[in-house]
Amino acid sequence: EWFKTRGISKDTLDELKVSVGKEYMPQTGKSENTIQFNYYVGGQLTNIKYRDARKNFKLYKGAEKVFYNIDNIVGHDTCVIVEGEMDVLALHEAGISNAISVPNGATLNSNNLDYLDNCIDYFDDMSKIIIAVDSDAPGQALQTELIRRLGAETCYITTFDDCKDANEYLVKYSSKELLSRITNAKPVPLENVTTFRDIEDEVTDFVRNGFKKGFQIGLDNFDNIFSTYTKQFITVTGIPSSGKSDFVDQMVV
């Protein structure tokens, strides 16, 4: 019933092998009813994240940290990285099966992404990696580090406007709107690289109006074909005694 309030169907829970059961939670010191997110690598169960009603979490100590749902990006050239298992379920509801989640959320001032180191080979053939993490400070720090490690040229980013994450966006809007939010992710701006979209207005103005006139020297026949700009280097050439100096003097005046 709780999953229904979060927009998650039984089909999604079954397909992603989410289970429930009793588990001892150290935060409460007793056995609790828990949701169990099962982590698989190569079809083998490698870890389980337990969540109780008080939002306490537990992962098995000593198990190798990996992305949740990592098996489902195999064979794809695109994937989506989110910050929690519930966001993976939300994207699955929107028809996106190739979404993965970091196992332990985002932490401000921590670049320890051992789960990425353990799964780095999965990204070798990815041509597009969409990062759709939370909008808070830890989430944005995680986004920055993922971009740094995976390469800005491959990464795309999206936000959820007035919502914190993908699951909240699904609940407030719809699976269709969530799908649109992901498919319209924007490429990460590359340092010292200008794209057409960056100068679209300037190009449109040039096509419609041509070059803008610079400084002119007052000779109509010349001004119709040439004008100057500040910080421009101009070389004046010609045969001897053709009036080069007089021409330069005219420009200076």
Describe the role of every protein-language-model region.
Residues 102-108, 135, 159-162:
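Short, acidic/turn-prone active-site loops that include or flank metal/cofactor-
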Residues 1-35, 72-81, 128, 141-201:
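Short, small/acidic-rich helices and loops at N termini and domain boundaries
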Residues 133-135, 238:
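Short glycine-centered, acidic/aromatic-flanked micro-motifs in structured strand/loop junctions
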Residues 3, 43, 131, 166, ...:
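A residue-level signal for conserved active-site and pocket-lining positions in enzyme catalytic cores
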Residues 88, 139, 143-147, 248:
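Short, highly selective alpha-helical patches that border small-molecule cofactor pockets
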Residues 191-253:
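The Walker A/P-loop phosphate-binding site
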Residues 23-125, 143:
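Phosphate-handling DNA/RNA-contact segment within nucleic-acid enzymes
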